[in-house]
């Protein structure tokens, strides 16, 4: 009876899993991630490596602020997990995944070097992406549409310091929560959702960048920058924000049928990683 239940669960699970030799992967047409901030203590590199392990795609788009050069210039921090993310990304590119890196503001020094290839990875300022159902999306990091970045870059760097301070506090909070058996919680995200000025800033950013896409006759826009994942319609434009791998650990994916979705790895991993022991038994 127990074995039968396991088999039923396995069959249901396989509806969303692609078989490839002895491994099982979540398979997508394209994956978009942004704001990883390698080189900072807030970066969730271990979770990103786990996400890499369980996903495969034809395309992988790195939508800016993957390497945080701002922070590395101030204080060098580069643990093994951060190096592993770079190596795994390069490995994906070598093994057939088309990987493209859209430059952001924390890695803006790369803009001076364009055209630039990093191994098999092409680095660009922006690009146009066409989905399976022929919809055209402008893909950018998004800092060019941030009023603070555009008119007061020094203020944005002060904000970056304050943000890192919040992340440091969050490490302590989540250590305690894990001890109590509770899920991770983001102080910075909580404040973004509650503080009136932060909510207004995010709303203005979203409208500004969506309006640009509309003027250029795109069906939608894919971006990052503000660390707030979203999939919404703004005046006829599909606004898609990848989120980040500091607080929310989210990614934007295009399914094989052309459907666009924001996935939260902390939630999805419970469905994937929990099956690993059984998958190993089945594959023997």
Which sequence ranges carry the predicted segments?
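N-terminal amphipathic/basic-hydrophobic helices that include classical n-h-c signal peptides
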Residues: 1-13
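C-terminal regulatory/interaction regions
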Residues: 272-284
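Active-site neighborhood of phospho(di)ester-bond hydrolases with catalytic His/Asp-centered motifs
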Residues: 33-34, 61-64, 100-105, 139-140, ...
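Conserved beta-sheet core of the metallophosphoesterase superfamily
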Residues: 119-125, 143, 148-157, 199, ...
């Amino acid at each position: 009876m127990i074995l039968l239940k396991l088999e039923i669960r396995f069959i249901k699970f396989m509806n969303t899993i692609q078989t490839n030799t002895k491994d099982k992967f979540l398979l997508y047409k394209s994956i978009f991630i942004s704001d990883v901030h390698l080189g900072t203590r807030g970066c969730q590199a271990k979770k990103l490596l786990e996400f890499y392990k369980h996903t495969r795609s034809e395309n992988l788009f790195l939508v800016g602020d993957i390497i945080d050069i701002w922070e590395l210039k101030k204080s060098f921090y580069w643990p093994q997990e951060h190096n592993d993310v770079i190596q795994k990304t390069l490995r994906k590119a070598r093994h057939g995944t088309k990987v493209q890196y859209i430059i952001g503001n924390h890695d803006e020094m790369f803009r001076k070097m364009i055209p630039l290839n990093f191994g098999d990875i092409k680095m660009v300022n922006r690009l146009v992406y066409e989905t399976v159902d022929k919809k055209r999306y402008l893909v950018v990091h998004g800092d060019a549409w941030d009023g603070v970045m555009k008119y007061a870059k020094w203020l944005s760097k002060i904000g970056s310091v304050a943000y890192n301070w919040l992340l440091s506090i969050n490490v302590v909070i989540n250590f305690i929560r894990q001890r109590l058996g509770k899920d991770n919680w983001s102080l910075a995200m909580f404040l973004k959702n509650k503080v009136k000025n932060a909510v207004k800033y995010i709303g203005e950013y979203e409208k500004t960048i969506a309006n640009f896409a509309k003027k250029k006759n795109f069906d939608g826009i894919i971006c990052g920058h503000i660390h707030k994942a979203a999939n919404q319609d703004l005046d006829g434009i599909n606004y898609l924000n990848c989120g980040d791998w500091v607080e929310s650990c989210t990614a934007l994916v295009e399914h094989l049928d052309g459907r666009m979705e924001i996935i939260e790895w902390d939630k999805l991993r419970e469905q994937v990683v929990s099956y690993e022991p059984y998958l190993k038994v089945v594959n023997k």
